[in-house]
Swiss-Prot record:
EC nos: 6.3.5.7
GO CC annotations, alphabetized: glutamyl-tRNA(Gln) amidotransferase complex
Domain of life from the UniProt record: Bacteria
Protein name: Glutamyl-tRNA(Gln) amidotransferase subunit A
Species in which this protein is naturally found: Methylorubrum extorquens (strain PA1)
Entry GO MF terms: ATP binding; glutaminyl-tRNA synthase (glutamine-hydrolyzing) activity
BP GO annotations: translation
InterPro entries from the UniProt entry: Amidase, Amidase_CS, Amidase_dom, AS_sf, GatA
Function: Allows the formation of correctly charged Gln-tRNA(Gln) through the transamidation of misacylated Glu-tRNA(Gln) in organisms which lack glutaminyl-tRNA synthetase. The reaction takes place in the presence of glutamine and ATP through an activated gamma-phospho-Glu-tRNA(Gln).
Catalytic reactions on record: L-glutamyl-tRNA(Gln) + L-glutamine + ATP + H2O = L-glutaminyl-tRNA(Gln) + L-glutamate + ADP + phosphate + H(+)
Record flagged with keyword Lipid biosynthesis: no
């Protein structure tokens, strides 16, 4: 029999409904797995008492025939989502010990639907990173290893704890956020599925902000179906978030069985970047073949401003971050380091509380917003953003239903491998994903195969605004063709 923590979310839902096991039993199975997996450092804090109390409520609901959509399903929460009464740190020393008195909209909707909270998941500090190496609470280690090697690998970032926990069976699914690829890249690195919904599909209320015009919440799970189930609960209008869109939430789970017959899938020629590994190109071609065999038409398209997306993103995002992170000053909450006066306290607190990568991005952002450089950098980057959005609009107007690209330019790299590199080398991990955030579009990463060293690789599908249903249908087609990747054996236990 499959261990309870190794079930998919859909299988666990069906098992709980059939009373094959209790919510308490599946919660305890996950808590035991978390205890055995401390070497991965996927969780910043586990919440066993809360999990078991929530599971008991779920068992009572199931016994009365009052089960809610996610009744009794144990989930991990990225530590960027405010959780009432539970430390919420954003992976930063400056928020050490901060316990919110409120719950994020996304997590409150999950609890409304009966989900069980296992704990808070590790991440790059303030979601700034592509490897989960910038967390003040230690690096998260990927459950994957290269064949014949014991060298630790990164799980991707910033949602590395979410992806690692899902891949290592430490939760059935996890919340995550995506500003430039922070759901899709770690999902690709860990053989999991991750979707960044359309900007505005999920409320940002109660999520610690990085770049407000780019941030969007979404799920990471082990299958396309599981992601569809979770997004159905996470999405929805919230009047507290002025960017939250007031439109009905579709039945995403029903969409996975639609298939792709009659759809047109675009292949952007600009994504064939110089130096792309041959195995990434082969996987991309294979993905197009799978969709063609399932009845889709494959069409080459042009997204001419793609080459400017990464530099424009690394102007817009740090600019917004420098503004958003100005609120952390040691006055009302979090770390406070005394100084000789109020200005000294601000300086000392921020110097001690922020990590190196966060300081770098705050400085870049402050620089591009300064009077002498605002027009030269920030305004120009926003103009590029508009052109990128128009490229996608033109592609969809030409009859394309979704766009297929690689999710990442490589498989996962080793812990510390990029530590001494130019920061731009790390930023290049987002080369295939940032355009989606700049245009506010939905994008999903789905596992499609393994590289020569046995590490997972993902394909990305990009959709029309608020057409996540087509993405789920196409992603399910790829998952069916590729087969589900066997997740790694528990070498850490």
């Amino acid at each position: 029999m499959t261990a309870l923590n190794e079930l998919t979310l859909a299988e666990a839902r069906d098992g709980l409904k059939a009373k094959d096991f209790s919510a308490r039993e599946i919660a305890q199975a996950h808590l035991d797995a978390i205890d055995r997996a401390k070497a991965l450092n996927a969780y910043i804090v586990a919440t066993p008492d809360r999990a078991l109390k929530m599971a008991e409520v779920s068992d009572q609901k199931i016994a009365k025939g009052e089960a809610r959509p996610l009744e009794g399903l144990p989930l991990g929460i990225k530590d960027l989502f405010a959780t009432q009464g539970v430390d919420t740190t954003a992976g930063s020393k400056i928020l050490e010990g901060f316990e919110p008195h409120y719950e994020s909209n996304v997590s409150s909707q999950l609890w409304r639907d009966g989900a069980v909270m296992l704990g808070k998941l590790n991440l790059d500090e303030f979601a700034m990173g592509s490897s989960n190496e910038t967390s003040a609470y230690g690096k998260t280690i990927s459950p994957w290893r290269r064949q014949g090697s014991y060298a630790p690998l990164v799980p991707g970032g910033s949602s590395g704890g979410s992806a690692a926990a899902v891949a290592a069976h430490l939760c059935l699914g996890a919340t995550a956020t995506d500003t430039g690829g922070s759901i899709r890249q770690p999902a690709a690195f860990t053989g999991t599925v991750g979707i960044k919904p359309t900007y505005g599909r999920c409320s940002r209320w109660g999520i610690i902000a990085y770049a407000s015009s780019l941030d969007q919440a979404g799920p990471i799970a082990r299958t396309v179906q599981d992601c569809a189930i979770l997004l159905g609960s996470m999405a929805g209008h919230d009047p507290r978030d002025t960017t939250s869109v007031d439109m009905p939430v579709p039945d995403f789970e029903a969409a996975i069985s639609r298939g792709v017959k009659g759809l047109t899938i675009g292949i952007p020629k600009e994504y064939r970047v110089e130096g792309m590994p041959a195995e990434i190109q082969r996987l991309w071609d294979q993905g197009a073949d799978w969709l063609r065999e399932a009845g889709a038409t494959i069409k080459e398209i042009s997204l001419p401003h793609t080459q400017y997306a990464l530099p424009a993103y690394y102007i817009v995002a740090p600019a917004e971050a420098s503004s958003n992170l100005a609120r952390y000053d040691g006055v009302r909450y979090g770390l406070r380091v005394p100084g000789k006066d109020i200005a000294g306290m601000y300086e000392n607190t921020r110097a001690a509380g922020f990590g190196r990568e966060v300081k770098r991005r705050i400085m870049i952002g402050t620089y591009v917003l300064s009077a002498g450089y605002y027009d030269a950098y920030y305004v120009r980057a926003q103009k590029i953003r508009t052109l990128i959005k128009r490229d996608f609009e033109a592609a969809y107007a030409s009859g394309v239903d979704a766009i297929l690209t690689p999710a990442t330019p490589s498989a996962a790299f080793g812990i510390g491998e990029m530590a001494s590199a130019d920061p731009v080398e790390m930023y290049l991990n987002d080369v295939f994903t940032v355009t989606v955030n700049m245009a506010g579009l939905p994008g999903i990463s789905v596992p499609a195969g393994l590289d020569a060293q046995g590490l997972p690789l993902g394909l990305q599908l990009i959709g029309r605004p608020f057409d996540e249903e087509t993405l789920f249908a196409a992603a399910q087609t790829i998952e069916n063709a590729a087969g589900r990747i066997s997740l790694p054996k528990a070498w850490w236990a």
